[in-house]
Amino acid sequence: PRRGRESGPAGPLPYAEPMTDRRLAVQAWESLFRAQHEVFDDIRTDFDGTELTQAEYDVLLTVTRAPRMTARLREVTGNMLISQPSVSRLVERMVARGLVTKCADPEDGRGSLVTATEEGAVIFRRIAASHARSIAERMARLSDAELAQLHALTAKLRDDA
């Protein structure tokens, strides 16, 4: 783990002393896990009655953020909370529904490229606007400074700060 001055979205983080209290570490982890679980359950309802499942939304989130709305299948899989075979089956169902296309990756003979169709992108944007409002409502209890700190801390835990 890195120590010292690190930076987050709000600038440098103060010097991080090594963790010494294992009980506090476990309590913090359990609290983070419970918060994530509760928020995830709440957010899941954002997709009730929409044209996309949460998993389909997650695929389109990765794909629409990529250049030319095209991402490698392994990038999509890396952003999902399900296994690679499950992602592959999900993408195949999305192809059948006309939400994405899938083709061989010319730069990687074993890989595939996933591209959002116009229909998939339109549906994604419509749901994304509502989903973003829902997330903002859930996060409104935190100040901008707390949100920046939360972002920095979770990035640090993911080791990509």
Task: Locate each region found by the language model.
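Short, charged, intrinsically disordered terminal tails
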Residues: 159-160
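Charged, amphipathic alpha-helical coiled-coil/dimerization segments
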Residues: 40, 92-155
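Short, locally clustered residues in the helix-turn-helix/winged-helix DNA-binding domain
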Residues: 33, 61-68, 128, 155
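Alpha-helical hairpin
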Residues: 21-24, 52-54, 116, 142
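N-terminal leader segment of winged-helix/HTH proteins
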Residues: 1-50, 97-99
